[in-house]
Amino acid sequence: MLYTLSRSPYACDLAALLRIAQHGDDLLLLSDGVIAGLTGSPAACALGASPLTLHALENDIVARGLSAHLSPNIAIISYTDFVRLTEKQPQQMAW
């Protein structure tokens, strides 16, 4: 499953997403969802302890000036890589 988080972790039920996540699932942080990847934040710590493989969209990180503040556990990816994730994970759920 590919989960996409496009809202701030403070404006969604991140705990619910983490409860249903399984090994082999991917999570892409995009738009305001990249805030969940800030180093040392409660959201980043919770994501790091989850079974999810974590990704964040580079354009959204740069647009918010967060390049130097993203957790090292999160792979920064391009739009092309986003397309590859959708090919890898045919089932998707937006948060």
UniProtKB/Swiss-Prot annotation:
Protein's name in the database: Protein TusB
Its annotated function is as follows:
Part of a sulfur-relay system required for 2-thiolation of 5-methylaminomethyl-2-thiouridine (mnm(5)s(2)U) at tRNA wobble positions.
User: Gene3D superfamilies of this UniProt entry?
Assistant: DsrEFH-like
Task: Give the organism, scientific name.
Answer: Sodalis glossinidius (strain morsitans)
Q: Which InterPro entries match?
A: DsrEFH-like (IPR027396), Sulphur_relay_TusB (IPR023526), Sulphur_relay_TusB/DsrH (IPR007215)
Q: Name one GO biological process term.
A: tRNA wobble position uridine thiolation
User: What PANTHER family does the record point to?
Assistant: PROTEIN TUSB
Quaternary structure note? Heterohexamer, formed by a dimer of trimers. The hexameric TusBCD complex contains 2 copies each of TusB, TusC and TusD. The TusBCD complex interacts with TusE.
Entry keyword Cytoplasm: yes
Q: Name one GO cellular component term.
A: sulfurtransferase complex
This protein's major location comes to: cytoplasm
**Keyword entries, A-Z:** Cytoplasm, tRNA processing
Which compartments does it reside in?
A: Cytoplasm
Q: Which family does it belong to?
A: Belongs to the DsrH/TusB family.
Disulfide pairings = none
